[in-house]
């Protein structure tokens, strides 16, 4: 018998959904406790040179320079174009081979740490959850997500345990991922679906219907049946879900 603290974060969110800090002269913005991450695409020389050429030919380099000169990019350091390019809001880094890497945002990790350490003083056990649809670079696909967890989620899970969490529980991709015992404490990278009510939604927005050329006479049941191809694709057809 004891007290359990349950806390959580999400790495899958729209930017406007993220909670924002307040100031003495401005209230904080309510929102989700976000776990941001840095995504880097490592590319070989030929691809990198083509990106540079495309940036200039399409005018994106001029737009970036104008934004920096106008001050809209804040005090960010100038990136060396000889090794790093930001193209269509994606970061590309010159390397020896192609690859993708991710790392957790340190400010968000520090925020996690503060509240985990506080919870350990008020509870007997601390459970930390993370909603994460992103995936790693290996393993088979189920839907648009791979079996492997992303690097930044592994980093965050280890960090949470190091700060005092007794258990880290991931969810989001709708299927089971691996389990790790880290410092004698369990990490579940995805618990899958204990209860999945994807097909029991009562209302759908108009654009959802229009995506499948459905009109005003159709119901949510019609939409869901059309989306799943009559149960032949997506969640309904893959037993892993």
Locate the predicted segments by residue.
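Acidic, metal/ion-coordinating pockets
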Residues: 1-241
